[in-house]
């Protein structure tokens, strides 16, 4: 009789762990993001295509994009984006990402870019293009259009 109880407890524990692994977890995939497009003289530029690109490499295998055009003040606003995935899915995705070796990416990653003709606008901070990697929850960007 004692042997049956042991198997019952093992089965119950495995079932609970599996259930927990399948529960979805919601995390922030991209922040609440405000961006203004300016030219090289810092004048705001309306009507410019601004693209937000984002992906949570630890929870999903495909990236996402949202496009908006800058308003009369040269600005756009992107609402925060959420990713919903189970712990099991996240574990599988992390293992899959790790197979990329030195090129592996993990966690949330987002950035914004402006496009107008042959000009591109990026948020450059300290000489590097800014990319959001999980925090803060709100980002303000200035995208400087430069011809390429």
Residue ranges of predicted features:
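Well-ordered beta-strand positions in beta-sheet-rich domains
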Residues: 34, 65-67, 75, 123, ...
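Short, acidic Ser/Thr/Gly-rich low-complexity loop/linker segments typical of extracellular
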Residues: 58-84
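Beta-strand-rich interaction surfaces with strong enrichment in secreted/lumenal proteins
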Residues: 22-24, 65-68, 102
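A mature extracytoplasmic/lumenal domain signature
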Residues: 49, 54-56, 80-82, 116
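Beta-strand-rich domain onsets/edges
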Residues: 8-32, 36-39, 43, 51, ...
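Beta-strand-rich cores of mature extracytoplasmic or soluble domains
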Residues: 87-148
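A short, structured loop/turn motif at beta-sheet edges
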Residues: 37-47, 72-73, 116-118
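Short, Lys/Arg-rich N-terminal segment immediately upstream of the first membrane anchor
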Residues: 1-6
């Amino acid at each position: 009789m004692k042997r049956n109880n042991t198997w019952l407890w093992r089965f119950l524990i495995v079932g609970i762990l599996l259930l927990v692994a399948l529960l979805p977890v919601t995390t922030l995939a991209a922040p609440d993001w405000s961006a203004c497009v300016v030219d090289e003289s810092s004048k705001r530029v309306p009507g410019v295509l601004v693209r937000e690109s984002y992906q949570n490499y630890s929870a999903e295998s495909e990236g996402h994009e949202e496009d908006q055009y800058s308003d009369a003040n040269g600005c756009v606003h992107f609402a925060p984006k959420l990713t919903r995935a189970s712990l099991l899915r996240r574990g599988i995705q992390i293992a899959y990402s790790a197979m990329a070796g030195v090129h592996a990416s993990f966690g949330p990653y987002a950035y914004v870019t402006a496009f107008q003709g042959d000009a591109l606008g990026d948020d450059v901070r300290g000489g590097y293009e800014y990319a959001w990697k999980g925090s803060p929850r709100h980002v303000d960007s200035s995208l400087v259009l430069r011809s390429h």
